[in-house]
Amino acid sequence: MTQRVTEVRREPDKSDHPESDHSESDHPERGHPDPFRIAGTVYASRLLVGTGKFASHPVMRDSLVASGADIVTVALRRVDLSRAGEGDVLDFVPAGMTLLPNTSGAQDAAEALRLARLGRAATGTSLVKLEVTPDPRTLAPDPIETLRAAELMVADGFTVLPYCSADPVLARRLEEAGCATVMPLGSWIGSNRGLRTRDAIEAIVETAGVPVVVDAGIGAPSDAAEAMEIGADAVLVNTAIAIAADPVAMARAFALATIAGRMAHLAGRPRAGSATVAEASSPLTGFLGAVPGGLPGLPGGGG
């Protein structure tokens, strides 16, 4: 069975990336002492992109290129595993991108494992984004079945990236089970409501020993920047790009926001102060006191 997409990733073509006008030394990830790694593989981009909800496969392809993403996730239920159909979604994934099949729609651990095995057989990749979402109203991840599936998949040789609730205890359990990342939700899938779980994500970031990828609910580039600023290692975005008026432009905006957020985190973003009054950034008290007679129009100044 011929593979269309493999785990082997290229060094991204500079023409594909929003930061392509900069040198390698200017890139906030390449050559930095904390590059983005998943299971030992280094990726240049910290933006992961999904493939659902696009108006057409060509629009999806162009948006993926504009995003500069190295990793693209696709629901196994949308893939023609028999490879008999024409125009399958995988045919429009740009060459060299790392495919991350997901088990979207799985109701329990057994179904998730079955989908993952089918995907591995069809694509040749052991990477899998684990999703177990039995509640059709919220698509909330089932914590019990997610952990159970993670244990089964790791034992079966998969590199598991689990979508999970923003629960620090569950995140620790998934890490202990051998997951390569944890992927806490920002808010409900497809809701575009941003980081409603910010406090919990910060707690996960503080203790996680594997990359933290914020997944679900990221509705604007500012949400992606916020996630990166508080220390997330990466973000996964789909709906906000796919349903934008201009998906290609939105993909580029998310790419730049992810880079900016990461740079802000590395630069040491100041925490919000506790003061309830303003604090001048440039006090003039000493300066005014040194001016004979003060300044006209200011307290103590000339008329």
Curated annotation (Swiss-Prot):
UniProt cross-references to InterPro entries, sorted A to Z: Aldolase_TIM, Thiazole_synthase_ThiG, ThiG
Major localisation: cytoplasm
Reaction(s) catalysed by this chain's protein: [ThiS sulfur-carrier protein]-C-terminal-Gly-aminoethanethioate + 2-iminoacetate + 1-deoxy-D-xylulose 5-phosphate = [ThiS sulfur-carrier protein]-C-terminal Gly-Gly + 2-[(2R,5Z)-2-carboxy-4-methylthiazol-5(2H)-ylidene]ethyl phosphate + 2 H2O + H(+)
Pathway: Cofactor biosynthesis; thiamine diphosphate biosynthesis
One Gene Ontology CC term in the entry: cytoplasm
Residues the record lists as binding 1-deoxy-D-xylulose 5-phosphate: G190, A216, G217, N238, T239
Gene Ontology terms describing biological process: thiamine diphosphate biosynthetic process
Spans annotated as Disordered: 1-37
Keyword set includes Transferase: yes
Enzyme Commission number(s) of this protein: 2.8.1.10
Keywords: Cytoplasm, Schiff base, Thiamine biosynthesis, Transferase
Localisation: Cytoplasm
Top-level EC class as recorded in UniProt: transferase
Top-rank taxon: Bacteria
Active-site residues, as the UniProt record annotates them: K129 (schiff-base intermediate with dxp)
Subunit and interaction comment: Homotetramer. Forms heterodimers with either ThiH or ThiS.
Family: Belongs to the ThiG family.
HAMAP family: ThiG
PANTHER family: THIAZOLE SYNTHASE
Official protein name in the record: Thiazole synthase
Organism: Parafrankia sp. (strain EAN1pec)
Classification of source organism: Bacteria, Bacillati, Actinomycetota, Actinomycetes, Frankiales
